[in-house]
Amino acid sequence: MHRLLLIVTTASYRAGAFLEAAGRLGVPVVVGSERPLALAAANPHGSLTLDPAALDPAVLAVVEFAARHPIGAVVAADDDGVILAAAAAAALGLRHATVDAVAAARDKHRMRGILAATGIASPRFARLAIAGDPREAARRVGFPCVLKPLALSASRGVMRADDESQLMAAFERLASLLSRPEVAAQGGAAARHVLLESYIPGVEVALEGLLSGGRLRVLALFDKPDPLEGPVFEETIYVTPSRLPIPAQQAIATATAGVAGALGLDEGPIHAELRMNEQGPWMIEIAPRSIGGLCSRTLRFGAGVSLEELILRHALGLEIESYERERLAAGVMMIPIPRAGVLRAASGQVQAREVAGIEEIQITVPIGQEVVPLPAGARYLGFIFARGETPGSVEAALRAAHDRLAFDKIGRAHV
């Protein structure tokens, strides 16, 4: 069987789940990462050093490797690798969304322009340089508005402003974040600009889907029961199946398919964030990759198939017996960071696991490591997973478990 090229960052949460899925399928894996892996010398055919920021040399390296060791599919685990995955797949003639479509989805400003031009419901928006003055753009967009970095993923750097003073404070804070050497180096030209959008009220959901030949299969629709109204937009709880009325769920699926089509996305996984209000669904973000962090552990299909196995089967052209999610409701809480500092201790995990419905608790930040909350931070303290008969019972279990955890010994950094 031909190899799978899995493109990941060395800091990825997602690599393990894809490697496990490949192991279940008996598919050999080549891991492509921006830095050499620790065991690369012991297994030279199992890894490639690929810098997503140097696209042409990275694609050439993949093509040269594939000439000696055939590759049957290319999958990116995270946002940083999706354009490289698309370009490598195109060079090898493999099944994947096009580079142009993936790049359009990755560029928040370009995505907004495409959607507005095709008549899809979109907020007012403007792009501006971090060296500029946001007040003129805000006069065109209006208040309340949301500042979004073009170079960062998820909710990092995203802030709401209800008036000019809040706008200037948020803009200064975001410009400072984007000017950090590591962010500027990773983001390139995108790190020098931000997007200003009119704020969209409504309940927020996340749709996990798989595109095949332009057809969208909805794998799961997650409710986000905690209001996401700003000033920062920290996601905490995801619960599926959604409790929205069926017509609303259908409208969300239709809107997502329309956005994917407008961008040219036609193959592979997508993770979409939408808001639903009295005017209907509004696309917030759509990413040409699967759900982030460890959140995919909430999803099982057919006879216990993981999301990652489903994605790999699609990419490799293998049979998929069922796209149906399991009967039980499931959910995850991404444990928020209450304040900046150094994590000195975490307690209450034994008590939290005793809550009915809780399946797993993982604290992913090592003791002694510095933690930073949103909008500057890029991670969570960990994850809580639950299953139950109803979405309501799952949400209640997640909240009860979180209440039993204690991170009250987060102290100031460099003490």
Task: Identify the meaning behind each predicted range.
Residues 90-157, 164, 176, 180-182:
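A conserved helix-loop-beta module that forms one wall/lid of the active-site cleft
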Residues 159, 169-173, 197, 204-226, ...:
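Beta-strand scaffold of nucleotide-dependent catalytic cores
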